């Protein structure tokens, strides 16, 4: 088994990190640059920033956040939210991001994936998918892709598994799958969804949505087949540290990069 990655996710709104439950009822979690620096010191393997405002007037704030963060951290940084063109991707990569995450824009313009992969390489393109279970009880499992996830998520009619297959064919180098049913609920990842995706994906898969404990992350990797596990609230609000998770995984035979940094506490919300 290859080394598995632990990735804190920072949802950024108006220059602050927030976290909600199923995309609603956001709580302030702190300053993004301070949190990123703390996670870097604590041994996180990567960081993900999502600009959940993503309006044109907020975009300059996000570019500045990425620039300041890139000057402080020395682990890969992925940035997503509102990236609608190759130029948008270029601005974030130039600001210091290592990868860009495409979601809603890719659904409405799938060739944006191919254009980004052609310009920057597949290793820079993460296809992020928000999926909701839509099968009736007793039916085979089925998940639909939603866009504009927030206060007004929009169904697309796209089957999540088929959309991911197409995204990979177009050049996505990594998949981040977020269970809308589990997001922020801290009841564990949707293992059935993860299994369905990892069974067909030749590229790395990041599990997102639902992590409430190191045990959930272990199951996401061992049972779900994820290459990396992403979490937000359990880290932001001090329930567990990166070291707690890595220790739990290592004790159960999951290979992780050793952590030598400090713990992430609640003092990063300046």
From Swiss-Prot:
One of its GO terms (biological process) is L-histidine biosynthetic process. It catalyses: 5-[(5-phospho-1-deoxy-D-ribulos-1-ylimino)methylamino]-1-(5-phospho-beta-D-ribosyl)imidazole-4-carboxamide + L-glutamine = D-erythro-1-(imidazol-4-yl)glycerol 3-phosphate + 5-amino-1-(5-phospho-beta-D-ribosyl)imidazole-4-carboxamide + L-glutamate + H(+). Pfam families: His_biosynth (PF00977). Keywords: Amino-acid biosynthesis, Cytoplasm, Histidine biosynthesis, Lyase. CDD domains: HisF. Belongs to the HisA/HisF family. This is Imidazole glycerol phosphate synthase subunit HisF. It comes from Chloroflexus aggregans (strain MD-66 / DSM 9485). The gene is hisF.
